[in-house]
Amino acid sequence: MGIIIGIDVGISTTKIVGLKDGKVTAPIRITAADPITSLYGAFGKYLHDNNIMFNEVEHVMLTGVGAAYVKSDIYGVATTKTDEFVADALGARYESRIDHAIVVSMGTGTSFVMCHGNDIQHIGGIGIGGGTLQGLSRIMLNTSDIKQVSALAMQGDIRHVNLQIGDISAQPLPGLPMEATASIFARAKNDASREDIAAGIIAMVLQTIGSASVLAAHGTDCRDMVLIGTLSLLPQCKEIFPGLEKLYNVRFHIPKYSEFCTAIGAALAYKKEGLS
């Protein structure tokens, strides 16, 4: 069996992985001005960097919003498109080794996919994600560079901008510890520092995603949430999601290659869809 290439094609960023003998090899990401340039650039670079010949590639599996722009096989290699939500679930399950979970795909917005064995269902989403973080940062901090915003946030203090339970109550409320957020940005002042604003923006996005994922699990017995997508790489995830775990009695997991899970899932879909 040759190499199966999984490609997650975004509007400007493409993520690509290879799958051979059940193992993920050398994931990379490429950013370009448009999805076609990004896709072909990523594919060419992947083959070049890993010394892979065209005849070693058995199949290319595409997913993501940018895949709609692709109308033919990639460089003459057999190419198939697969559903993005299915790819999210397959990749998250493969990397986390968790069979029953809500897959939280944190992209420009955020989608929720229930994965229970081979039963995969898209159960909803919210318009909060990386696009929100970039847009608010552009307005409030004059930058949309997520790495820069994250670095600023590491120097900030969320207590300077967010209202906590301890600010409005002399004792914890039922199920709510003193450090739980009562209102996001409710304490922000006109002279709030860039660092505190950055901390507030990131906390708002991650807390909202975390709380929404818990609501998505309401009425089910699912207590595991697998976080995938670029935002899962933010160092603030390691601070915010453990607090939400205690608050809601759930478990958040960030697997290896969390940024590439959708591309991995696309490659895995080759066998699931009976193409092999």
Residue ranges and their predicted role:
Residues 62-68, 215-244, 259:
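Glycine-rich phosphate-binding loops at beta-strand->alpha-helix junctions
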Residues 3-41, 120:
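Short glycine-rich, Thr/Ser-proximal phosphate-binding strand/loop in the N-terminal lobe
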Residues 29-32, 43, 48-84, 94-95, ...:
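Short beta-strand-loop/turn "lid" adjacent to the catalytic site in phosphate-handling enzymes
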Residues 78-85, 242-264:
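Conserved phosphate-binding/catalytic loops in two-lobed NTP-binding clefts
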Residues 70, 75-104, 109-119, 264-272:
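Conserved phosphate-binding catalytic cores of ATP/NTP-utilizing and phosphoryl-transfer enzymes
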Residues 90-95, 133-137, 252-276:
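Glycine-rich phosphate-binding/hydrolytic loop that grips phosphoryl groups
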Residues 118-173:
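Glycine-rich phosphate-binding loop plus the immediately following alpha-helix
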